[in-house]
From Swiss-Prot:
It comes from the Bacteria. GO terms for molecular function: ATP binding; proton-transporting ATP synthase activity, rotational mechanism. It comes from Alcanivorax borkumensis (strain ATCC 700651 / DSM 11573 / NCIMB 13689 / SK2). F-type ATPases have 2 components, CF(1) - the catalytic core - and CF(0) - the membrane proton channel. CF(1) has five subunits: alpha(3), beta(3), gamma(1), delta(1), epsilon(1). CF(0) has three main subunits: a, b and c. It is found in: Cell inner membrane. Produces ATP from ADP in the presence of a proton gradient across the membrane. The gamma chain is believed to be important in regulating ATPase activity and the flow of protons through the CF(0) complex. One of its GO terms (biological process) is proton motive force-driven plasma membrane ATP synthesis. The keyword Ribosomal protein does not apply. The lineage of its organism: Bacteria, Pseudomonadati, Pseudomonadota, Gammaproteobacteria, Oceanospirillales. It is a peripheral membrane protein. This is ATP synthase gamma chain. Keywords: ATP synthesis, Cell inner membrane, Cell membrane, CF(1), Hydrogen ion transport, Ion transport, Membrane, Transport.
Amino acid sequence: MASGKEIKGKIASVQSTKKITRAMEMVAASKMRKAQERMTASKPYASRMRQVVAHLANADLEYRHVYLQEREVKNVGYIVVSSDRGLCGGLNVNLLKNVVKSAKAWEEKGAKTSYCVVGSKGMSFFKSVGGNVEANITGLGDTPHLNDLIGSIKVMLDAYESGAIDRLYIVYNEFVNTMTQSPKNIQLLPLEAGSDEELKRHWDYIYEPAPKELLDELLVRFIESQVYQGVVENNACEQAARMIAMKAASDNAGDIIRDLQLVYNKARQAAITQEISEIVGGAAAV
């Protein structure tokens, strides 16, 4: 059994770690609330854009944009949204498992895959396992801006327009609630027609100045809005997962401290009992 001094040293060490994890939990909780506000603020725009584009995909347009055209899938692109930092449980692991599973399914059909990776955790993964990374973005921080994403998004859009990729997906973590975050895999291109009955009764549009000019701009803005929404939502998931992970770490540290206190008390009791026995034994010998 370890000495009382050694056990007290371990207790002090775990208490110090608990203070750190507790502080990180509180910071993550604060950041999560701010990230949720950004996510909630951007959702109506992204949702409305998706609805408008779904109507367009259902419509009989005089100009059929390349983003609306289905073609044989030989190359698949993924925009993978991960985090820059760890200590957020299995958030990135589950996300990357989803990407690998989807990519493997396409590769089994004979398609090639390429990636645009957001976040250093995703980049570390693809450096480790390999993968055709066409673009990457790191260091977005806790307040990502659309301007930081546009360049990398354009790389994938240009690849789609040139025929280098035939289908484009975005994979990010969906914020279900504070306790639950799940990977979400959405097809960005070609744009899918809406399946709702309301969307099938699509609107008739009048295009100003012309369908081509309008759609060229609108559809790019739509893709950018969906990627930005994914990044903002993934950031909220990251903070929620980190808060939960740090709370679990703090709780575990508390359990360890209690166990060590019991061990320390037993060691102290044993030492006192031994001293009493020695005194009694010495007195009896006299």
